[in-house]
Amino acid sequence: MSKISNSGGDSKNTLYCSFCGKSQHEVRKLIAGPTVFICDECVELCMDIIREENKSSMVKSREGVPTPQEIMEVLDDYVIGQTYAKRVLSVAVHNHYKRLAHAGKNADVELSKSNILLIGPTGCGKTLLAQTLARIIDVPFTMADATTLTEAGYVGEDVENIILKLLQSADYNVERAQRGIVYIDEIDKISRKSDNPSITRDVSGEGVQQALLKIMEGTVASVPPQGGRKHPQQEFLQVDTSSILFICGGAFAGLEKIISDRGKKTSIGFGASVSSPEDRRAGELLRQVEPEDLLKFGLIPEFVGRLPILATLEDLDEEALVQILTEPKNALVKQYQRLFEMENVELTFHENALRAIARKAIERKTGARGLRSIMEAILLDTMFELPALEGVQEVVISEDVVAGSARPLYIYAEREKEKGSVSA
């Protein structure tokens, strides 16, 4: 039931939303039902939920596998830019799960698994793409850091622990885990230190590549349910990895130079391009990556062979970072606005303030990953003070606030009052 209150001698009744509890003065519209009221904000929230559920049901095609266009459409809701990488991933994931859906139907042709390698700078969306793909297909997902992995028998994390994590995300349902997605980050950090095979044992570099080969290609892994090291008296869960999709990602710093050097060797003669490879953006160079470049970088041939699909991501420019701040469903600006709404305060960012935040992230070379730390630093004092203040209706963030030369503007319900002077 909605609440109705009489304020002192005021004869007017105040109506409240039956769902969120906001009064008619705090919302644009309050719609009356037989015994309840609903505000425009709750109506919009309900519409978002319905749209999301409709999209999830539409994402299933006749065979139960979403089409590449449907996958790309959902990726667009969460990941800004990176059109080429999203297109490659959409096709690869569609083909992978179509292969599983038709397994055993056509025995004359056996379709092999195609794992994926994502190459792009830090903070460009590699991890988010992998997480979103798992959400679209509704399969278990786990993420591993390649830098913590070692060969079996050495101190560190065994590669089979990756499969254990996948099992845990599937609530130990082996059948579901066998259709899951594994994302291995920082894969470039396990590259060989030189082009020549290592003389000494490299247990965290080439050794890890060797250890990953079997589970990526397809094997029956014996996984201890409780994790840790194996011992003979222990019971094991048998997990077939041949249907698990492995997506590996890394920044591959320095790979552009290897590609550029290869380009210089071939750009000779009258028909050669006059533009220097160095003049091109790193993203354009990365898109020309060949398996031989990855071998020179330090990945072993067998490992490169297990990753036949290459998707490259580009550095995010200022425009893309501003879009990331404001447009996706989980956009940072929307998240902080919701936090401020809980204090009944509206949070407003000027357009030039958002661009200043984006420029800061570019200067720090942290990509989209650095946006949250910048936002936290800007809003820290405000979030500390706000719960103890009364009557604040709106907080405005300008470019000067981002630069640190001014305090946020506090607008009060009864009067407009600036919190602090123009200079900090």
Curated annotation (Swiss-Prot):
<feature type="binding site">
    <location>
        <position position="20"/>
    </location>
    <ligand>
        <name>Zn(2+)</name>
    </ligand>
</feature>
<comment type="subunit">
    <text>Component of the ClpX-ClpP complex. Forms a hexameric ring that, in the presence of ATP, binds to fourteen ClpP subunits assembled into a disk-like structure with a central cavity, resembling the structure of eukaryotic proteasomes.</text>
</comment>
<dbReference type="InterPro" id="IPR010603">
    <property type="entry name" value="Znf_CppX_C4"/>
</dbReference>
<dbReference type="InterPro" id="IPR027417">
    <property type="entry name" value="P-loop_NTPase"/>
</dbReference>
<dbReference type="GO" id="GO:0016887">
    <property type="term" value="F:ATP hydrolysis activity"/>
</dbReference>
<dbReference type="GO" id="GO:0140662">
    <property type="term" value="F:ATP-dependent protein folding chaperone"/>
</dbReference>
<keyword id="KW-0862">Zinc</keyword>
<keyword id="KW-0479">Metal-binding</keyword>
<dbReference type="Pfam" id="PF06689">
    <property type="entry name" value="zf-C4_ClpX"/>
</dbReference>
<dbReference type="InterPro" id="IPR003959">
    <property type="entry name" value="ATPase_AAA_core"/>
</dbReference>
<dbReference type="GO" id="GO:0008270">
    <property type="term" value="F:zinc ion binding"/>
</dbReference>
<feature type="binding site">
    <location>
        <position position="39"/>
    </location>
    <ligand>
        <name>Zn(2+)</name>
    </ligand>
</feature>
<dbReference type="Pfam" id="PF10431">
    <property type="entry name" value="ClpB_D2-small"/>
</dbReference>
<dbReference type="InterPro" id="IPR046425">
    <property type="entry name" value="ClpX_bact"/>
</dbReference>
<dbReference type="InterPro" id="IPR004487">
    <property type="entry name" value="Clp_protease_ATP-bd_su_ClpX"/>
</dbReference>
<feature type="binding site">
    <location>
        <position position="42"/>
    </location>
    <ligand>
        <name>Zn(2+)</name>
    </ligand>
</feature>
<dbReference type="InterPro" id="IPR003593">
    <property type="entry name" value="AAA+_ATPase"/>
</dbReference>
<keyword id="KW-0143">Chaperone</keyword>
<keyword id="KW-0067">ATP-binding</keyword>
<dbReference type="GO" id="GO:0046983">
    <property type="term" value="F:protein dimerization activity"/>
</dbReference>
<comment type="similarity">
    <text>Belongs to the ClpX chaperone family.</text>
</comment>
<dbReference type="Pfam" id="PF07724">
    <property type="entry name" value="AAA_2"/>
</dbReference>
<feature type="binding site">
    <location>
        <position position="17"/>
    </location>
    <ligand>
        <name>Zn(2+)</name>
    </ligand>
</feature>
<dbReference type="InterPro" id="IPR050052">
    <property type="entry name" value="ATP-dep_Clp_protease_ClpX"/>
</dbReference>
<dbReference type="GO" id="GO:0009376">
    <property type="term" value="C:HslUV protease complex"/>
</dbReference>
<comment type="function">
    <text>ATP-dependent specificity component of the Clp protease. It directs the protease to specific substrates. Can perform chaperone functions in the absence of ClpP.</text>
</comment>
<keyword id="KW-0547">Nucleotide-binding</keyword>
<dbReference type="InterPro" id="IPR019489">
    <property type="entry name" value="Clp_ATPase_C"/>
</dbReference>
<dbReference type="GO" id="GO:0005524">
    <property type="term" value="F:ATP binding"/>
</dbReference>
<protein>
    <recommendedName>
        <fullName>ATP-dependent Clp protease ATP-binding subunit ClpX</fullName>
    </recommendedName>
</protein>
<feature type="binding site">
    <location>
        <begin position="121"/>
        <end position="128"/>
    </location>
    <ligand>
        <name>ATP</name>
    </ligand>
</feature>
<dbReference type="GO" id="GO:0051603">
    <property type="term" value="P:proteolysis involved in protein catabolic process"/>
</dbReference>
<dbReference type="GO" id="GO:0051301">
    <property type="term" value="P:cell division"/>
</dbReference>
<dbReference type="GO" id="GO:0051082">
    <property type="term" value="F:unfolded protein binding"/>
</dbReference>
<dbReference type="InterPro" id="IPR038366">
    <property type="entry name" value="Znf_CppX_C4_sf"/>
</dbReference>
<feature type="domain" description="ClpX-type ZB">
    <location>
        <begin position="5"/>
        <end position="58"/>
    </location>
</feature>
